[in-house]
Amino acid sequence: GDAAGVKAALRGLDLALELLFSEADRVRCGHRLLVDRLFEVVLIQLLRWLLDHPQEAGVRSGFICGMSDVRLARALTAMHAAPGEPWTLERLAERAGMSRTAFAAAFREAVGQTPIDYLADWRMVLVQARLREGDSIKRLAAELGYASSSGLSRAFAAKLGVSPRQWLARLAAEG
């Protein structure tokens, strides 16, 4: 069944987990560093398994499902690496090595939204994070591919229901 498949897929973790737990109980020179590195190995192996088996992990759509398809992963990685680029469906499909139609259908099936909607959402995540850090709307608009700061403000309000200024005020009031 599913449990046997998961067990078999994660068998490679046995040694890393065994080392991690035995090292975590010791007080030896370098043990903290070794525990940190072993934890990173375990985390990477779990993420690799998740990317290779999203359905078995119960993931039905989203970033993980998109990254589990090598072709879509190329487009997703490009969007994440350069969110301010003027990405178009054509450019993303080319990055994925697919036709526009095949790319659009595969992306929507795996990720649950269109590539351009995904990019817009990713940009908003970045805008929110950078606003929290004190960046200006003007700077963010220039870096994230918006024609103007007012264009970014309109997109922000359309997505979140409030202006960036109102959003920051709410954040400060909750904080």
What is each PLM-predicted segment?
Residues R74-A93, M98-S99, A105-S150, K159-V162, ...:
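Terminal helix-turn-helix DNA-binding modules in bacterial transcription factors
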Residues D2-L10, A24-F39, L43-E85, E90-R91, ...:
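Short, Lys/Arg-enriched, Trp-marked, Pro/Gly-tolerant hinge/linker segments that flank
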